[in-house]
């Protein structure tokens, strides 16, 4: 008498487990590997800013790769600055400078809602602004050629080079 063929039981109607699991040839179930992405966060921000607007899958992929690239740049610059200053940890205060270095020149001039604001009478910390011998750049050079820039003062948009 022939043996009955071993098949996986058919998924019940409305069951979502069949969608999330892939089948091997020997009948054992295997979970798909999870991919991390920023798509849910991009979607939440989009709905908060423009509630009636949607986003295509390809556009979400572009936004995801953009955010990965920005975070890689910021992390690389932060670790480089921590190494230069002989620090083993990166604090939240020290993370603003790499953001200013990696982002376009207009981004650091936009204040963050949670960023601590410094009054004009308070002296600037020595590590965030260049010394008195800092040279200004000629206006013909693009900002990326000369190096990083930071906002001067309390987010007034006046940019000065970090290079001495």
Swiss-Prot record:
Which Gene3D superfamilies does the annotation name?
Histone, subunit A
Q: Which residues carry this modification: N6-glutaryllysine?
A: 17, 35, 44, 47
Q: Which residues carry this modification: N-acetylproline?
A: 2
- List compositional bias (Low complexity) regions by residue number: 1-12
> Its Gene Ontology molecular function terms?
DNA binding; protein heterodimerization activity; structural constituent of chromatin
Phosphoserine: residues carrying this PTM: 15, 37
| Sites bearing N6-acetyllysine, chain numbering | 6, 12-13, 16-17, 21, 24, 86
Q: Which residues form the signal peptide?
A: none
The residues joined by the cross-link Glycyl lysine isopeptide (Lys-Gly) (interchain with G-Cter in SUMO2) are 6, 21
Q: Does the keyword Nuclease apply?
A: no
Q: Which residues carry this modification: N6-lactoyllysine?
A: 6, 12, 16-17, 21, 24, 44, 86
**Sorted alphabetically, which keywords does the UniProt record give?**
Acetylation, Chromosome, DNA-binding, Hydroxylation, Isopeptide bond, Methylation, Nucleosome core, Nucleus, Phosphoprotein, Ubl conjugation
Residues that the record marks as modified (N6-butyryllysine) are 6, 21
Q: Which residues carry this modification: N6-methyllysine?
A: 47
The cellular component terms of Gene Ontology attached to this UniProt record, alphabetical and capped at eight, are: nucleosome; nucleus
Subunit annotation: The nucleosome is a histone octamer containing two molecules each of H2A, H2B, H3 and H4 assembled in one H3-H4 heterotetramer and two H2A-H2B heterodimers. The octamer wraps approximately 147 bp of DNA.
The note filed under miscellaneous reads: The mouse orthologous protein seems not to exist.
Q: How is this protein named in the record?
A: Putative histone H2B type 2-D
Source species: Homo sapiens (Human)
